[in-house]
Amino acid sequence: MTSSDFYLRDTCRLCENNKLERVIELTPTPPGNYVLRADEVEEPRPSYPLEVYFCNDCAHVQLGHVVDPRILFQRRYTYVSSTSPVFVAHLREYASAMIKRFSLGKGRLIADIGSNDGTCLRFFQEHGFEVLGIDPATDIARTASDRGIETIPDFFGFKKAQYLRKERGPATLITSHNVLAHIDDLSDIIKGVEHWLDDDGLFIMEVGYLVDVYQKVWFDTIYHEHLDYHTLTPLLGFLGRHGLEVIEVE
C-alpha cells in the first residue's frame, strides 16, 4: 500500500459540504472481489482504511477513503452478473417492465453504465433495441463484446458522454445497476448522463438502500467498492441540482 493508491476525501460526494463526521471505523482490509491464486495466498496484500462518514449537511452516508478504482475494478475483477440466477431473473423482468412502463420504441439506443458481462443489455437487445455497454473491467467487457453485446472497456464520465453522443447519438435510456455506490466523482457521472440522454430520455438506476444495511445489519456490504450508502432525501437533492427530474421511486 502506498499513499498514491488511495486518498481521504474531505467533502461530501452529494452536496460537496465539508461537514463530515466519522461514525464507523473498521479495521483496514484488502480490497474485496479479488480472488487469489494458490501461489499468492501467503503473499502480503495491501490493506486500506475502511471508515464511514456522515454528512451533517445533507445526511448522506459514505466512505471517506477512496482506493484507486484501477486497483478495485481493472485488476482481476471477479464479479460477473450472469453467475447469479436471481439477478439474471431480476434483469429479465426489469427489461420487460421498463419497455412496457415507458413505451420505449424499438431500435433506439439503450446504454448501461457498469454493464459487466452485458446480461441486462442482452434482454433489451432481444426486444429489438440497439445496446451499448460501458464497463472498466477489461476482461469482462471483452467477454460481453464477444457475446454480441458491444461494450466499451472504460470508465464513464462527462468526457466519455460527449464522445458517445457524437459518435452514437443520444440515448433513449441509460441504466445503471448497483454502480453509483462505486463512484467517487458522482457529479461527473450525472453530468455525463444528462448530456448523453435524448430530450425525452430516461435514466434508471438501482442503488443499495442504507435503511436495509442498518435494519438488517448488513455490515459485510461496507467495503472499498461501496463508497456510498444511499437514502432518498440526499439523492433527490443531488439529482435535482444536476437538472434531472425524479419521476418514480421504488
Task: Please provide the spans of the model-predicted regions.
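A short glycine-rich, Lys/Arg-flanked "PGG" loop and its adjoining helix->strand segment in the class I
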Residues: S187-L202
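Conserved SAM-binding motif I beta-strand of class I
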Residues: E130-D135
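A conserved beta-strand element that flanks and buttresses the S-adenosyl-L-methionine
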Residues: T172-T175
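Conserved SAM-binding loop of SAM-dependent methyltransferases across substrates and taxa
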Residues: D117-G128
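Conserved SAM-binding strand-loop segment of SAM-dependent methyltransferases
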Residues: G148-Y163
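Conserved class I S-adenosyl-L-methionine
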Residues: K106-N116
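Short, glycine-/aromatic-enriched active-site segment of Class I SAM-dependent methyltransferases
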Residues: P31-Y34, F203-D228, L232-P234
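N-terminal juxtadomain amphipathic helix
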Residues: T2-P85, E250
